[in-house]
């Protein structure tokens, strides 16, 4: 009888320890994803936020005069789409840092709030990525319909940094999508 009770207690200990490992593994994966989202969005904001380039460009006033060489500066805050991009990534990075701290609290009542805020970050990042990408494509190709010339042939470094920051932010937004999917899956499994 004692051996039977001992075996059932050992089995319960095994189940409990396995459950703790699974919870810890899930918590660790959430923590890693949140830290990754923080690193990606903060790097995207910094790379884009320090982006500027000055080039000397010839301007032809009339065909009879020689060209006038003028220094022209490209900065991220000259375009509202780029301002939106930097601010959105700064917000997402701040939220990722706060959510890492909130995940240590471990309150189950916070899970729906964090899920909602994760969804908000996904929407914010994807919209800012779209805005920055649209302006980036204009810079690379121009728009012949409205006579906008391409500028990336002049400001190559600036355009390359824009492209790099958009890629980083896009990966960061995919990490937030993974967080939303994992959290929703976890909530669904707990409701069964």
Curated annotation (Swiss-Prot):
User: Does Kinase show up as a keyword for this record?
Assistant: no
TM regions (residue ranges): 30-50, 82-102, 119-139, 162-182
Q: Which residues are glycosylated?
A: 52
Just give the chief location class: membrane
Q: Which family is it part of?
A: Belongs to the Casparian strip membrane proteins (CASP) family.
Listed under subunit, the entry gives:
Homodimer and heterodimers.
Q: What is this protein called?
A: CASP-like protein 1E1
What organism does this protein naturally occur in? Ricinus communis (Castor bean)
The upper taxonomy is: Eukaryota, Viridiplantae, Streptophyta, Embryophyta, Tracheophyta
